[in-house]
Amino acid sequence: MTKQIFRKYVLLFLFTCITLVGGCSGRGTNSSSDGNTYDVDAKGIPKFVAVDYIELGKIYRISKFRSSEGHDYSDDFETCRSMKHYFEPKSNVDWSTTKVFSPVKGTVSKIYQEWAGTQIQIKSKEYPAFYFIIFHINLANPLKVGDLVTAGQQLGTHIGSQTMSDIAVGVSTPRGWKLVSYFDVMSDSVFQGYQARGLSSRDVVIISKEARDSDTLTCDGETFTTSGKLENWVILN
């Protein structure tokens, strides 16, 4: 998918959010009302994800955390940056066959019909302040809020070539909603699969807050109006 085509679908996504579902918050799930919080600054980010959410063998490249790809997706502490990861399948793969799994055992906390497929938000059982937000799924079976899912359970497949798969991880902290990189919460055993595809460290797919702040982006609503100078993508071997 070319960058021009991707931008076109981003604009379609934003238009659909505004006109059909009342807007697309860049903060994902706001979980503070249930009382579960986790202080990542004091305790660090736990590496508890033991199952990858997607068929890695079918993925060509991954956008970096805090990139300027897609649209603004930020939290209570940062703004105007994409604090999630896009996973783009290989060009020789039927994107709609790419399997999507629950990365953790938990409960479906929210579910939305998007302009392309279904968005599912999963509240972790082990760390109930952590939420996993997976976009653009073609569900294998109907799901509803409150349903239990197991780690590794196939949720469905990616919707298709009209857009990329993306995943965000949010944490309800004592000071507000915070987005962290999916790579920060995956176990070493899961990350080994990415190392086998050429990633030397988790930092390769994460733009630090300091680096992003030094290469400031501008936004009009959730639309990026500048792209910055930092590389947005990591291509896998």
Where are these regions (language model features)?
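Zn2+-dependent peptidoglycan hydrolase active-site motif and core
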Residues: 97, 102-142, 165-168
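Surface-exposed, glycine-biased beta-strand/turn segments
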Residues: 28-119, 150-151, 201-237
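C-terminal motif of bacterial Sec signal peptides marking the signal peptidase cleavage site
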Residues: 20-23
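Short hydrophobic beta/alpha edge segments that flank linear recognition/processing sites
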Residues: 119-122, 149-173
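Bacterial N-terminal signal peptides that target proteins for export
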Residues: 2-11
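Short peripheral tails and domain-boundary helices/loops at the edges of structured domains
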Residues: 172-215
